[in-house]
C-alpha cells in the first residue's frame, strides 16, 4: 500500500464473484437450517442476520452489472451454494455446478489433497455444537485490574487510571471485584483504543464482553455486530461507563455478573441475548 494510504481495487472477474456470492448464500442457508433446529446460539444468530443483510446488499449491487437473463435472487443462489458445498466437501462432481469444479480435481497430479476425499475424515473428538464456546481473543500483555476491599470511589479511580494508560490498538481488560475476599464479579472486555493527535485516547470499538458468575460460569456475553460496534468516542465512554457504574450503586450484597450483563445489554436494547434463566438471575 502506498504512503498516501490509497487503496487499489483488484477485480477478480465475474466468475469468481458469482462463485463467492453463491457460496456465501449456501452458508446462509446452513445457518438458517441450524436456526430452525434451535441449535444456533445468540452470536450465531447475529452472524446469520448480518450475513443475510450483506448478501442482500451485495446481490442487489451485483445484479445491476449483470444482463437481466443472468440475474439471480438470494433463494436461487442459496440452492447453487448448497450444491457447491457438496462438491467441495465430498468432491462429488455429480452435484453438477456449471462452470465450477474444485481446483484439486482439475489438478489431482499436483494436489496435496489426499485422494481428494474428505468423507472419511473423522469429526474432531469431543467437539459438539454445545461444546464450542467463544472466549475473548488473545491480546498481548492484557491489563488485569483486581479491586480488593476497595470503596467505590477508589475502585472507580483505579479503573479510570488503568483504562487511560492503554496503548493504541487492541486491549483486553479483566475486572475482578472482591468484596470481603469474595470474588463477586468478573468481566472481560475486548476493544480497540484510538490515540488522537492531542494525546487523548478513546475507545473506538467494543469487540466482546463476557460476564462470569462466582463459580466462573459464563452467564452472558456480547459479541460485536454491526449494531454493537462503537461508532464514536462518546459511545465508547458511555459503554464503559455503563459497566463501571455497576460498581457505584451501593448494593449491600455483592454485585452479580448477571445483573451487570443485563445492565450493559440494556444500553443496546439487546436483553433478548440472555436466556430466560439468565435474565431472572
Swiss-Prot record:
Subcellular location: Host cytoplasm; Host nucleus
SUPFAM superfamilies reported for this sequence: S15/NS1 RNA-binding domain
Residues covered by region (G1P2-binding): 1-103
Region (RNA-binding and homodimerization): 1-93
Entry GO CC: host cell cytoplasm; host cell nucleus
Highest taxon listed in the record's lineage: Viruses
UniProt cross-references to Pfam families, sorted A to Z: Flu_B_NS1
GO molecular function, one term: RNA binding
One GO term of the biological process aspect: symbiont-mediated suppression of host type I interferon-mediated signaling pathway
Main location: host cell
InterPro entries referenced in this protein's UniProt entry, alphabetically: NS1 (IPR004208), uS15_NS1_RNA-bd_sf (IPR009068)
Keyword vocabulary terms for this entry: Host cytoplasm, Host nucleus, Host-virus interaction, Inhibition of host innate immune response by virus, Inhibition of host interferon signaling pathway by virus, Inhibition of host ISG15 by virus, Inhibition of host PKR by virus, Interferon antiviral system evasion, RNA-binding, Viral immunoevasion
Phosphoprotein listed as a keyword: no
Residue ranges annotated as motif Nuclear localization signal: 50-55
Sequence similarity: Belongs to the influenza B viruses NS1 family.
Subunit structure: Homodimer. Interacts with and inhibits human G1P2 conjugation by UBE1L.
Function: Binds and inhibits the conjugation of the ubiquitin-like G1P2/ISG15 protein to its target proteins. Since G1P2/ISG15 is an early antiviral protein, NS1 may inhibit the host antiviral response. Prevents EIF2AK2/PKR activation, either by binding double strand RNA or by interacting directly with EIF2AK2/PKR. Also binds poly(A) and U6 snRNA.
Protein's UniProt name: Non-structural protein 1
